[in-house]
Amino acid sequence: MNLDESSDFFKNADDVVDGGTSIFKYTEVKTFTAEETNQWFIDNVKPDYKPPYKPGTMVEEIELTETTTFVRVYDNMPNGSGMYGSWVMKAEDIEGLTPQEIQNKFALPNTPKYVCDVELEAGTHIRVGEVNALDGWGSGGGTQYDLIGQRIGDFKNERLLEGN
C-alpha cells in the first residue's frame, strides 16, 4: 500500500483508538496542521487565545461512529473553568495522576478540582491532537479533544478529583 492508498484507507475506515482501557471508533474527516488549528482559535474564539495544539504536529477532525464517553476536568471557581466546556480527554489519560499532574499534562490555566463524564453521540465531529506547552500553565504533551466550538454533549456525574 502506498502513501496515497494508506491515507485514503484511514479517511474511509473506522479506526479504533486504543489508549488503554477505552476503545472508541471514529472516521477521520480532515487533517490540519496545529498552526492552522491554533489560528482558528484566534479567529473564532478570541484574538489572544493561547495556542492549544503543539506546533509542528497534526490535528485531526474526526467523526465519532458510536456514542463515546470522555471526561472533563475543571476548577469550578469564579473566572475559572466549569463543568460545561469545549475540552475533554480520555479517562485513562488522567487515571492515577494528581490534579497538579493533570494541569501540567494538559497545560491548564488552573489546577482542576472536579471531573465529570461527557457523553458525545455518534456523528459528532471533534478535533484531537497533542497539547501545547504553555508558560505558566504546563508542559503539555497529553492528547486533547476539542468540541470545535459546538455546545454539545451530555455533561454528568460530577465528582471531586482524587487528591482534592
Where do the model's predicted regions map?
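Catalytic toxin/effector domains delivered as secreted proteins or via bacterial secretion systems
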Residues: 3, 8-164
